């Protein structure tokens, strides 16, 4: 089957990119590809028989027209000026059978005009982390970019140490970022900002294209998508680590996996990025940062969208966030209805977990085994303050009884939203260390496990992290 590629970005948004081709690595070789995603995209298996080929930037497929996009952004709350695709190249936009498109973005593809002081490369460590994280999030049901392939090489790349250069093929419906809009707003080119908005509406919000109020309705949906995404991050214990405006997806996708982390111990102020000295991107600050980023996006639209309309959309953020978060957390607790005491029960559980540094994922998974008329719980042994747990658990079981559903019905719901497996940093690190020694077994094994996060397991994938696993530090180079 011949794949079809279109060139919408190149044709419709002149002045927003530089056309250039990838720079291949030395002795590139394919070490992993996403069979399930490839099937979804109707990619012939024969394409993966070439060790590098398009996956290593050595060849292009017919219809591809590679380019690097320019954008700007606020980093850690400070205007950083021009950024752009410093090590990634958009190879092409695949046209799927249903008429939608999928970007093929090659990360680690070499120097671009936007590389600044960088080398344009990615390392094996970071490409493995992103591939694992994006697929883990996808199977958790959270909107995200996807990983299609990883290529490693003999090219040395200099970070904290010398590491093997690698490339990741990332796919997504769009790589439109808040930073694209900021770039042209701060260059005082409001017509370019409007062109970006029109492009987004035409291709991703086409039902609004003929509406006279299209910009307000579109921005309101961007706000809602962002609020929903952040709510989902918070419920699974995901910390992004570097929520700069250039890392914010217009479509509400999780984008740019760097120093991310899933909670081990429940620590509301968890900081996963060791470069985040002030804790701006701590776990509990993510909802506020997302709103701040939306405010920066709204500012770029102010030349052609009424400020009152923008503020009205921004004002809806908190309610959308709380609605999505509340619905998901009630499911995690097994509540079939909404009752006035629900928030108090959840907050008391969080307080208990924070005091005892309870494992976030394991706590909710074990809570899924609760029988409403039994005081026995395997979760009790996870707490030192048994009296405090017993008091909370007794009131929790009374609350469960109000819903008048069977234990099996409720347990089935809870186990469908409380994962047994999340991508803990130590699991990724173990796969990385093996891969750097040439053994890809654990990389493939972990990828396969992450496809079924809600299934019970009896291996160390669902155990508490070892002591060394809790001390892992990750930075933006991750």
Swiss-Prot record:
Where does the signal sequence lie?
Answer: none
Residues annotated as binding Mg(2+) are 247, 256
Q: Which residues form a coiled coil?
A: none
Q: Report the domain of life of the source organism.
A: Bacteria
Reactions the enzyme catalyzes: L-seryl-[protein] + ATP = 3-O-(5'-adenylyl)-L-seryl-[protein] + diphosphate; L-threonyl-[protein] + ATP = 3-O-(5'-adenylyl)-L-threonyl-[protein] + diphosphate; L-tyrosyl-[protein] + ATP = O-(5'-adenylyl)-L-tyrosyl-[protein] + diphosphate; L-histidyl-[protein] + UTP = N(tele)-(5'-uridylyl)-L-histidyl-[protein] + diphosphate
- Specify whether Magnesium is a keyword of the entry: yes
What molecular function terms (GO) are annotated for this protein?
A: AMPylase activity; ATP binding; magnesium ion binding
Cofactor section: Mg(2+); Mn(2+)
EC class (word): transferase
Q: For binding ATP, which residues are annotated in this chain's numbering?
A: 84, 86-87, 107, 119-120, 170, 177, 256
Q: Which Pfam families match?
A: SelO
Q: Where is the active site?
A: 246 (proton acceptor)
Listed EC numbers? 2.7.7.-, 2.7.7.108
Family, per entry: Belongs to the SELO family.
Per its database record, what is this protein's job? Nucleotidyltransferase involved in the post-translational modification of proteins. It can catalyze the addition of adenosine monophosphate (AMP) or uridine monophosphate (UMP) to a protein, resulting in modifications known as AMPylation and UMPylation.
Identify this protein by name.
Protein nucleotidyltransferase YdiU
């Amino acid at each position: 089957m011949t794949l079809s590629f279109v060139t919408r970005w190149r044709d419709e948004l002149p002045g927003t990119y530089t056309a250039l081709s990838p720079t291949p690595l030395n002795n590139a070789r394919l070490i992993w590809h996403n069979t399930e995603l490839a099937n979804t995209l109707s990619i012939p298996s024969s394409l993966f028989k070439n060790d590098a080929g398009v996956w290593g930037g050595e060849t292009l497929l017919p219809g591809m027209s590679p380019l690097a996009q320019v954008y700007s952004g606020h980093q850690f709350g400070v205007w950083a000026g021009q950024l752009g695709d410093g090590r990634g190249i958009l190879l092409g936009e695949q046209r799927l059978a249903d008429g939608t498109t999928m970007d093929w973005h090659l990360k680690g593809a070499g120097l671009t005009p936007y590389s600044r002081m960088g080398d344009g490369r990615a390392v094996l460590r970071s490409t493995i982390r992103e591939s694992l994280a994006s697929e883990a999030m996808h199977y958790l049901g959270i909107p995200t970019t996807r990983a299609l392939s990883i290529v490693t090489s003999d090219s040395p790349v200099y970070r904290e140490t010398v590491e093997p250069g690698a490339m990741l093929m990332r796919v997504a419906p769009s790589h439109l970022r808040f930073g694209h809009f900021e770039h042209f707003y701060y260059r005082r080119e409001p017509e370019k900002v409007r062109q970006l908005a029109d492009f987004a509406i035409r291709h991703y919000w086409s039902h609004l294209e003929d509406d006279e109020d299209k910009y307000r309705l579109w921005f309101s949906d961007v706000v809602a998508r962002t609020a929903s995404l952040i709510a989902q991050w918070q419920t699974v214990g995901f910390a992004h680590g570097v929520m700069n405006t250039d890392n914010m997806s217009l479509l509400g996708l999780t984008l740019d996996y760097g120093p991310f982390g899933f909670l081990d111990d429940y620590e509301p102020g968890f900081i996963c990025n060791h470069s985040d000295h002030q804790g701006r991107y701590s776990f509990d600050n993510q909802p506020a940062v997302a709103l701040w980023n939306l405010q920066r996006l709204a500012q770029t639209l102010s030349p052609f969208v009424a400020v009152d309309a923008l503020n009205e959309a921004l004002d809806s953020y908190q309610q959308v966030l709380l609605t999505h978060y509340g619905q998901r957390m009630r499911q995690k607790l097994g509540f079939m209805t909404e009752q006035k005491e629900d928030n108090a029960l959840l907050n008391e559980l969080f307080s208990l977990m924070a005091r005892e540094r309870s494992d976030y994922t394991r706590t909710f998974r074990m809570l899924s085994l609760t029988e409403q008329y039994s005081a026995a719980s395997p979760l009790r042994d996870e707490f030192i303050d048994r009296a405090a747990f017993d008091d909370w658990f007794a009131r929790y079981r009374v609350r469960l009884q109000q819903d008048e559903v069977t234990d099996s019905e409720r347990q089935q719901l809870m186990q469908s939203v409380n994962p047994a497996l999340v991508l803990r940093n130590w699991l990724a690190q173990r796969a990385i260390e093996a891969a750097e020694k040439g053994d890809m077994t654990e990389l493939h094994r972990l990828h396969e496990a992450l496809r079924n996060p809600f299934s019970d397991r009896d291996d160390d994938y669902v155990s508490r992290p070892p002591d060394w696993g809790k001390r892992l530090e990750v930075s933006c180079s991750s």
